[in-house]
Amino acid sequence: METRKGYQAIAKYLMVSPSKVRPVANLVRGKSYPEAVAILEAMPQKGARLILKVLKSAGAIALYVNRKLDEDSLYVSALTVDDGPRLKRVWARSHGKRDILLKRMSHITVVVDEKVGR
């Protein structure tokens, strides 16, 4: 049995919380490439813009590596949103106290592959 890896693009250290990006990622995982691009372009979320950039990059890599492919034959085979490092920031509170704000970062990985026998 042949294992296929596909064409991968990664964006790291994005200043958006993974919990805000994951619902957007769940909408396009497994969709065809043109359909995923159309869905993401219509969404207002910041996470949609970031996923769209990584998705277009993965599509460009696929078309560059394999010149026989076209965009219609690609689909999103894997899309993961992982936690990145956290920036700790101080938020001043009353009576000389403080709270710690965690600015969360995300790592987005998109893998596109050719549809085979679908």
Which stretches of residues belong to each language-model region?
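Structured, basic alpha/beta domains of bacterial-type, RNA-associated proteins
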Residues: 2-15, 23, 31-118
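Short, positively charged, Gly/Tyr-enriched micro-motifs
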Residues: 28
